[in-house]
Amino acid sequence: RDRSPSRGLGDVYKRQETKIEGTTLYIREGIEAEVIANQELVKDFHLEIITPDQYHTYSETIMDVQPIATKEGDAILGEGATRVLDGVVMMLTGTDEGGVQIGEFGSSEGYLDENIMWGRPGCPDKGEIFIKGNIVVQEKTNMERRGPMAAHTAFDIITQEIREVMKELDDSFIVEDEELKSIRRPGKKKVVIVKEIMGQGAMHDNFILPVEPVGILGARANVDLGNVPVCVSPLEVLDGCIHALTCIGPASKEMSRHYWREPLVLEALHDEEVDLCGVVFVGSPQINAEKYYVSRRVGHTVEMMDVDGAFVTTEGFGNNHIDFASHIEQIGMRGIPVVGLSFCAVQGALVVGNKYMQYMVDNNKSESGIENEVLGCNTLCQEEGIRALAMLKAAMAGEEVKAAEKKWNPNVKSTNVELIEAACGKKIELVDNEQSLPMSQKRKEKYD
């Protein structure tokens, strides 16, 4: 699949029509009324253009960060050409009419520059412009499926109008071509990535396989699919096959942009020692009986693939760790080495376990090992992808992997990183944590 970034945008303004001229994107004035009218549950909407000099602006909780991309011609996700706008992202924020944040187990409201972990796969990069829409949904629907769904669907009105403009641009606007290839490597160790996504209902849901990258049209909610495993290609993942609705704790939330830049998928694709055959998305139901029903489907699906090893990842922590552990068990009991990746540390410590959970990678970056409500802080990054691949290779080779300590010890991570660096002869760049950000009032009062 080709990604063709249109000229990096320097400015975004509101004007009479939505269009792109040179390095400037114009968004139609009055489009807010159409966003509100699109969904009965949307009661108010405000559109802001946030430039880098305005990062110290108050915002309600960030529900999602999305790339702006569209398919060329009749191309479908994972194939053909995709046009991408660089230098700008869509950002959805919101509350209900009572002022309650659309989030659960924490929220990221506050000054943007104090509550975003810049550069995380799912977060904005410093220097980008935010097309930020703040939606107000009907009171008390913030914790129902229909509230967040209405917010995301209405906000996509603006993104889709931009996509339609992008389709009409001539090739002079293309400044860079990036080719993404999914190369199979017969004879190498075949591996699969299982990504557990939220599916408990209420706000915990995702749209899968829309027509447009991170779009709405044509997508199916994984809750409506029964949360059963859905197999996709690595390129479908990187082309925006997941529109994330989940509003779990901000620090471990995988936003739509996270899948667009999914680090483990990218690391496995580029690793010449493994053969990445695909990615399996599986929802996390609310009821335990449904969790085990779905988990058995995961085990059979992975067994049918005849893989040599597997990864199981999850966002969030707590309830979803029940099926996270069960996925690992169902794969492991079939004689397949499996590495689990999750935020654990102190606050996300696993509530369940089994004998197959011997190969684990912790996504924690926070200083205290907690959900600190800083967007993206504890999400899977390249460094976890590198560690997980090294661990799975060791497991597939039958090498010893030491048992985890009973209590969280951040030195385990640094020791493993040093071992991998010594073996591979290259430096692993570790990302910053919340200590690199200006101190927010919330962090000062609650965490630090």
Indicate residue ranges for each PLM-predicted region.
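Long, well-ordered mid-to-C-terminal structural blocks that present hydrophobic/aromatic surfaces
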Residues: 233-322, 327-329
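Single conserved hydrophobic/aromatic residue that forms the stacking wall/gate
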Residues: 1-13
